[in-house]
Amino acid sequence: MVNLTSDEKTAVLALWNKVDVEDCGGEALGRLLVVYPWTQRFFESFGDLSTPAAVFANAKVKAHGKKVLTSFGEGMNHLDNLKGTFAKLSELHCDKLHVDPENFKLLGNMLVVVLARHFGKEFDWHMHACFQKVVAGVANALAHKYH
């Protein structure tokens, strides 16, 4: 669950409805892989991730980024039940993929950077604060199975 006021929820959902999940998803995942290169070990099957240019040109990074943000969008539709929404993904990442749950926070922060870059002045301090709450809630829900 994310503690947003009714006005904050309305603002977050309005901005989210403008997000190009393919573009922003690929960029957010790409940034994660470049800024935190140790995360690349989970994506060895993606091919060449040897340079930032290779990461951002990688079709598999773009496709998986879109998949990630599409799933994130499902969470946006269920802000009051994030743990339920992400229960199966939490189990997958914990039991099968063995992803360090700290990576969910890192990816959330990359998403905030990408949204700020794409939306400029529209992504003001208020919107930033709201989205930090959302990405923290999603990261917490994804880490739920680990507890």
UniProtKB/Swiss-Prot annotation:
The modification Phosphoserine is found at residue 45. CDD domains: Hb-beta-like. The modification N6-acetyllysine is found at residues 60, 83, 145. The modification S-nitrosocysteine is found at residue 94. The modification N-acetylvaline is found at residue 2. Pfam families: Globin (PF00042). Red blood cells. Keywords: Acetylation, Heme, Iron, Metal-binding, Oxygen transport, Phosphoprotein, S-nitrosylation, Transport. Residues 3-147 form the Globin domain. It comes from the Eukaryota. It comes from Dasypus novemcinctus. Heterotetramer of two alpha chains and two beta chains. This is Hemoglobin subunit beta. GO terms for cellular component: blood microparticle; haptoglobin-hemoglobin complex; hemoglobin complex. GO terms for biological process: hydrogen peroxide catabolic process.
